[in-house]
């Protein structure tokens, strides 16, 4: 993940993660402070903002689709072609991995909290549609850019430190998140 330039669509975010990794190395070298560097894919799940403009991508799509359903809209617009593939991390998986990782004394390398499994934006949109009970059509607005075509994390280091780590099923995580937001939007 340190090879090459960070994709322009995540330039600030990606470079901040790299800077934190280097900062952790400095703390270890200068002050003997051990750190754990966990790298996450896109996260989603209950507890995030109810404002679709201030939340993560998948939660934002869930909120907007629930709003479209309540408004009786016949269409739901997704930006881009729907073809980019993204890996998603349910919030409970992140918390579980973080708690388990704190038991390690020192990790000199970053660990991806990834499954090496992704879903296209279109696939996730259709899962959300099913979970929400939205009866309208999903429309892809191709005047918006897609960003990087595939963002999936490797899992070899996660398997080394937490070989039995179990992830939530993506559709189950979406259903749980829809249930959380149904009464809030």
Which ranges hold each PLM region?
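Short, hinge-like loop/turn segments at secondary-structure boundaries
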Residues: 53-56, 156
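Short beta-strand/turn micro-motifs at beta-sheet edges
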Residues: 30, 65-66
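Active-site phosphate/pyrophosphate-handling residues
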Residues: 19-22, 56, 60, 89
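Cytosolic eukaryotic protein kinase-like domains
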Residues: 3, 59-62
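Conserved sequence/active-site signature of Rossmann-fold short-chain dehydrogenase/reductase
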Residues: 43-45, 57-58, 94
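Residue-level preference for alpha-helix termini and adjacent loops
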Residues: 1, 5, 9-12, 42-43, ...
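Catalytic helix-loop patch of NAD(P)-dependent Rossmann-fold dehydrogenases
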Residues: 1-37, 43-44, 48-53
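C-terminal substrate-binding subdomain of Rossmann-fold SDR/epimerase-dehydratase oxidoreductases
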Residues: 61, 67-185
